[in-house]
Amino acid sequence: MKLLRMTPGKGDVLLAEGDPSNAEDEERLIEEFRRQLDLGMWAAVPLEGEAGRREATMVRDFSEIPKAAERVIFFPRAAGGRR
């Protein structure tokens, strides 16, 4: 599994990579996942929908990530809105 961060103008940046079935890798992936959420990022897992259509599922906890997921993409929340 790869944890990637979308960065404007630079594309995806690899934050962490590992096998979640390996306890050491899983711990590192969970730590980075939590760190990104603490920084205010959102997390999405790309999935292939019906008829090969691209979709993504938002996740808030590492345990919500499907076992077969190859990557999780972090991106900043939209700026603006009500104050």
Where are each of the predicted segments found?
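Hydrophobic alpha-helical segments that drive targeting, anchoring, or assembly
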Residues: E32-F33, W42, I73-A78
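Generic, low-specificity signal for short hydrophobic/alpha-helical stretches with a mild N-terminal bias
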Residues: L15-G18, E50-R54
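Extended boundary segments
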Residues: M1-G40
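Short, compact, well-ordered microdomains
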Residues: A51-R83
